[in-house]
Each structure stands twice: as C-alpha cells, then as structure tokens.
Amino acid sequence: MSVQAEIGILDHVDGSSEFVSQDTKVICSVTGPIEPKARQELPTQLALEIIVRPAKGVATTREKVLEDKLRAVLTPLITRHCYPRQLCQITCQILESGEDEAEFSLRELSCCINAAFLALVDAGIALNSMCASIPIAIIKDTSDIIVDPTAEQLKISLSVHTLALEFVNGGKVVKNVLLLDSNGDFNEDQLFSLLELGEQKCQELVTNIRRIIQDNISPRLVV
C-alpha cells in the first residue's frame, strides 16, 4: 500500500496533516484542548467534536455516518481523562474521494482515520496507542482480496471493507480491532482471510506512519 503523508501543514490550528492514498486525498486539522460550550462539556474527560466535509457539495447523512465511525475509532486512542472539561475539534476535509461517492465511502473513511491520527500526534494530544486503517475489496469473479482497491476495482467488487487496528509496543503488537466496516456478500473464510491480510498490511502501514512522524517531528526537537 503506497501512501504519502505530511504533518504540520496548516497554520492557526494545533495540529494538522495531509494523507494521500492513490486518488484519495484528505486534510485533517485538530484544535484543542479548548474550552467547550456548556452542552459539550464532560466533567471527567475530553469531549470530541468531529466534522467530515465532502469533496463536493455540503455534508449530508453520508458524512454524519463517517463522523460516527471516525469517533468510534479515535475515542479509544485518546487519553481523555487527561483533559477534563475540555474539547478537541477534529475536522477532516476530503479533497479527492478516489471512489464513486454514491456507492462507496471506504477509501475516504480509511484516509480520514489515518489523517486524524497523524493530526492528533502533531497537536500533542496524549494517546494510548497507535492506529492504522486500510480499505479492502473482494473481487466478484475471482474472489481475490485486494488491499487499497482502485475506483475501477470497487465497481467490480463483491464486498468492500474498512479495517482499522490498534497497535501498542511501538506499533509491533495488535491490541484491538477498532473498526471492521463491511458491505456486500462474503463468507466466514473470506472474512478470516481478509483479516489476516489486513493485519499484515496495517502493520506495514503503521511502520510507515511511525517513519513519517519521526521524519516530521525530529527536526523540531531540541537536543
């Protein structure tokens, strides 16, 4: 899986990142911890406000669903008790979807997850662990399992999946499956096969993410 990523690309926010995978491109910004509105405040932990903006037009129910899935992935990663009565705003702007938006959202969701994690790191938010997410498709005629499928491969897919895994011990150990979002027809054997392949590819991606973080943050450190 070939990706490009950069952190600290935006001014006037606490953290930001850009994540590109094939034809899908996402920019994410993080602001916080900041003072929340009264209705958003949580007495003992950090509150999250997550916004996903589409590449074209205004946000619809589709983006609200993406926001809910993104929240489910990011919440376990953040050490929220460190920031009681505070708010963190996470905004993902999709620049290029790289897929048919009327039918699919897995590529966008996967890139939003990876971009949000990098932006949280850039913002200095305390995290419990790392995460990496990949899109997967099972092709209709051959039943081949394709990681990071193209828009053309998605159109001939039998099922599509977004996998997000939580990593600990420097990205070497999988702690938890944060998300497995599936749509389409598949059997149990195919599910186990894609999880096995997905774990391997997520491991490679999290290693790449660690390198990106190191390359971007090391120059800022005062030795």
From Swiss-Prot:
Compartments, record wording: Cytoplasm; Nucleus, Nucleolus
Entry GO MF terms: RNA binding
GO-annotated cellular components: cytoplasmic exosome (RNase complex); exosome (RNase complex); nuclear exosome (RNase complex); nucleolus; nucleus
Keywords: Cytoplasm, Exosome, Nucleus, RNA-binding, rRNA processing
Chief localization: cytoplasm
GO biological process: exonucleolytic trimming to generate mature 3'-end of 5.8S rRNA from tricistronic rRNA transcript (SSU-rRNA, 5.8S rRNA, LSU-rRNA); nuclear mRNA surveillance; nuclear polyadenylation-dependent mRNA catabolic process; nuclear polyadenylation-dependent rRNA catabolic process; poly(A)-dependent snoRNA 3'-end processing; RNA catabolic process; RNA processing; rRNA catabolic process
Function in brief: Non-catalytic component of the RNA exosome complex which has 3'->5' exoribonuclease activity and participates in a multitude of cellular RNA processing and degradation events. In the nucleus, the RNA exosome complex is involved in proper maturation of stable RNA species such as rRNA, snRNA and snoRNA, in the elimination of RNA processing by-products and non-coding 'pervasive' transcripts, such as antisense RNA species and cryptic unstable transcripts (CUTs), and of mRNAs with processing defects, thereby limiting or excluding their export to the cytoplasm.
Family: Belongs to the RNase PH family.
Assembly information from the UniProt record: Component of the RNA exosome complex. Specifically part of the catalytically inactive RNA exosome core complex (Exo-9) which may associate with the catalytic subunits RRP6 and DIS3 in cytoplasmic- and nuclear-specific RNA exosome complex forms. Exo-9 is formed by a hexameric base ring of RNase PH domain-containing subunits and a cap ring consisting of CSL4, RRP4 and RRP40.
Other observations noted: Present with 10800 molecules/cell in log phase SD medium.
UniProt name for this protein: Exosome complex component RRP46
